[in-house]
């Protein structure tokens, strides 16, 4: 289990779709000798918007629902990982990140409900008080806003319902020609 980190919580990043292919492996390298570079879904989305679609950073940032400087940092991180993998002959696997799976399906307003991620108990949201500042009386865990974004741990169950994003099950899935 990952430790909770101090500081500001990461905001949701909006992506248009989850990746259909989650790992890319260089050919000519023994599978057991390949190192991995782990790239997040939001880094891939930033590269898609800026590099493939040719959007300006400000426009792409609006689509991902992040600030322009944050978009730049996400894009830089993704490009650095891809360059490292290409130069070093490493496998690129795409998994995780704090994302909203599909932007078009997101309701414009979130429900006024705080949810315990451990036991699933719901509490009414108090305007002006972030859900994360309230504690579940049963589990002693911080609450989350219902309908909020998916972090690495929270998305595992929901990803399985939509489309599995993770490491391949077999070597055949690793081969990209």
Curated annotation (Swiss-Prot):
Pfam families: DUF134 (PF02001). Disulfide bonds: none annotated. Residues 147-177 are annotated as: Disordered. Belongs to the UPF0251 family. This is UPF0251 protein Cag_0886.
């Amino acid at each position: 289990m990952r430790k909770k980190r101090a500081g500001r919580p990461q905001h949701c990043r909006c992506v248009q779709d989850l990746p259909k292919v989650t790992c890319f492996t260089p050919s000519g390298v023994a599978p057991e000798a390949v190192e991995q570079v782990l790239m997040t879904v939001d880094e891939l989305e930033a590269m898609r918007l800026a590099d493939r679609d040719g959007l300006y950073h400000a426009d792409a940032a609006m689509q991902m629902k992040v600030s322009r400087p944050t978009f730049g940092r996400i894009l830089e991180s993704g490009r650095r990982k891809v360059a490292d993998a290409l130069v070093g002959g490493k496998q690129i696997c795409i998994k995780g990140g704090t994302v909203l799976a599909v932007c078009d399906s997101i309701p414009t307003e979130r429900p006024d409900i705080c949810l315990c991620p451990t036991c699933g108990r719901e509490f009414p949201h108090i305007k002006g008080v972030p859900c994360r500042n309230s504690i579940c009386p049963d589990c002693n865990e911080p609450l989350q806003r219902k309908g909020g974004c998916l972090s690495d741990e929270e998305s595992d169950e929901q990803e399985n319902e939509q489309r599995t994003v993770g490491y391949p099950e077999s070597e055949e899935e690793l081969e990209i020609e």
